[in-house]
Swiss-Prot record:
PANTHER family: CDK5 REGULATORY SUBUNIT-ASSOCIATED PROTEIN 1 (PTHR43020), MITOCHONDRIAL TRNA METHYLTHIOTRANSFERASE CDK5RAP1 (PTHR43020:SF2)
Alphabetic keyword roster: 4Fe-4S, Cytoplasm, Iron, Iron-sulfur, Metal-binding, S-adenosyl-L-methionine, Transferase, tRNA processing
Single GO molecular function: 4 iron, 4 sulfur cluster binding
Name of the featured protein: tRNA-2-methylthio-N(6)-dimethylallyladenosine synthase
Pfam families (UniProt xref): Radical_SAM, TRAM, UPF0004
Record InterPro entries: Elp3/MiaA/NifB-like_rSAM, Methylthiotransferase, Methylthiotransferase_CS, Methylthiotransferase_N, Methylthiotransferase_N_sf, MiaB_methiolase, rSAM, rSAM_horseshoe
Residues annotated as binding [4Fe-4S] cluster 2: 162, 166, 169
Residues covered by the Radical SAM core domain: 148-380
Gene behind the chain: miaB
Family in the record: Belongs to the methylthiotransferase family. MiaB subfamily.
Length: 445
């Protein structure tokens, strides 16, 4: 009888990818995935530490799991093995055992390949096991072959960690220094997912355009080199990459957006702030004019490219003028979609110890204003698509029986009513008939 594995994933797409790999890792040891936490023999929380709210969600979920464990005990069942993985594990370590002593294993994002051994020790009644080593090579060398198919669109991790040390960010402390997988590893995994009917590959990294992986004859490949290499794979129709840092947008990568048809015309390029003063305080290593220059060059390379970004409001020392500079940048760039957040001080980062923290009510007010402008731009872009024909990759079922959902080249969700489920996994021409803030509606031509 197989054992059941339940994984709950928080945060970024890198965590989503890691969770798939954890499933692959544990499958040979008899663990099959379940979506029902109540039947799980192992419960893994793959966590995010980017903001305080995200971290506290982990502890709230652990509280619910404790109640579940008590219920199992009352029913005469063995308790599930509880694992906290990911960035909260890396950042808080032994503190997790102090706050939640019923947790069995704490494992960082670079160490989860050791989970089979750690789990076997818990089965032998060892307690409070922890592995927070930063050995990126070991992680990637020990990743299993792809077992669980991700579907029509697949994530592949090519780079981890970050050397930028932005003063608001915990990534260098939780994911470690920048490390790139070899071209051979990435290519082999790409071939595997395409053989399982993936049509789109999204290359992942905390700073993906800093990729410098070893290729044939020890040649170092840039991200542009890697994308060109992967574009040669038959039956692979779309390529994307995320998340990028402006200072690593090289000439060859920008030019590739104009020459490689498989590279989608949508780029997530976070700027965080439109104020030169705040950009400097954040240690972003560029100013607003540098960012504008990259945007202009991308649009020269490919006129139909659409941009996305991240913004943080209320960073320590942010004045009304600084916030107005951010609004000005947003209005000048005109984004297709964006993510925006209030600054959240993270322990151990330089921003957290500054004495000029912004009051919460001011951060909330600024976020509301910014999100209103971003929503206006997003809706305007979506409405501009009405009446056009777009190539949509259908990758999932909708809520209703005859509904399927796909993605445009610009990452917009498109809903159609069509009982023909054979369209799933295919790229189809769709005429867009209706636009909302977060989605489009269309009809098959």
């Amino acid at each position: 009888m197989s054992k059941k594995l339940y994984i709950k994933t928080y945060g970024c797409q890198m965590n989503v990818y890691d969770s798939v790999k954890i499933q692959d890792l544990l499958y040979p040891f008899g663990y099959e995935s379940t979506e029902d936490i109540k039947e799980a023999d192992i419960i893994i929380l793959n966590t995010c530490h980017i903001r305080e709210k995200a971290a506290e969600k982990t502890y709230s979920e652990l509280g619910r799991i404790k109640k579940l464990q008590n219920t199992r005990k009352q029913e005469g069942l063995n308790p599930a093995i509880i694992v906290v993985a990911g960035c909260v594990a890396q950042a808080e370590g032994e503190v997790i055992f102090t706050r939640t002593p019923y947790v069995d294993i704490v494992v960082g994002p670079q160490s989860y390949y050791n989970l089979p051994e750690l789990i076997s020790k818990v089965v032998r009644h060892e307690k409070h096991l922890i592995d927070l080593d930063f050995v990126e090579e070991a992680k990637f060398d020990n990743l299993p072959e792809q077992l669980y198919t991700q579907g029509a669109s697949s994530f592949i991790s090519v780079q981890e960690g970050c050397d930028k040390f932005c003063t608001f960010c915990v990534v260098p402390y939780t994911r470690g220094a920048e490390f790139s997988r070899s071209v051979e590893q990435v290519y082999r995994e790409s071939l595997k997912v395409v053989s399982n009917d993936t049509k789109e590959i999204i290359l992942l990294g905390q700073n993906v355009n800093a990729y410098h992986g070893k290729g044939p004859k020890d040649k170092i490949f840039t991200l542009a080199d890697l994308l060109k290499h992967l574009a040669q794979i038959p039956n692979l129709e779309r390529l994307r990459y995320m998340t990028s840092h402006p200072i690593d947008m090289t000439d060859d990568l920008i030019k590739l957006h104009g020459t490689e048809p498989k590279l989608m015309p949508f780029l997530h390029l976070p700027v965080q702030s439109g104020s030169n003063k705040i950009l400097k305080a954040m240690n972003r290593k560029h100013d607003r004019d540098y960012y504008f220059n990259i945007i202009n060059r991308l649009r020269e390379a490919r006129s139909d490219i659409v941009l996305s970004s991240d913004f943080i409001v209320g960073f320590p020392g942010e004045t009304e003028k600084d916030f107005e500079d951010t609004l000005d940048l947003v209005q000048r760039v005109k984004y297709g979609q964006c993510y925006s957040f209030k600054y959240s001080p993270r322990p151990g980062t330089p921003g957290a110890i500054r004495t000029d923290q912004i009051p919460e009510h001011i951060k909330s007010k600024r976020l509301t204003i910014l999100q209103k402008e971003l929503a206006t731009q997003q809706l305007a872009f979506n409405e501009s698509c009405v009446g056009s024909t777009m190539k949509v990759l259908f990758d999932r079922d909708g809520k209703f029986e005859d509904q399927i959902i796909g993605k445009t080249p610009y990452m917009q969700s498109v809903y159609i009513h069509n009982p023909n489920k054979s369209l799933l996994g295919k790229i189809v021409d769709v005429i867009i008939t209706k636009a909302a803030l977060n989605s489009l509606t269309g009809e098959i031509l």
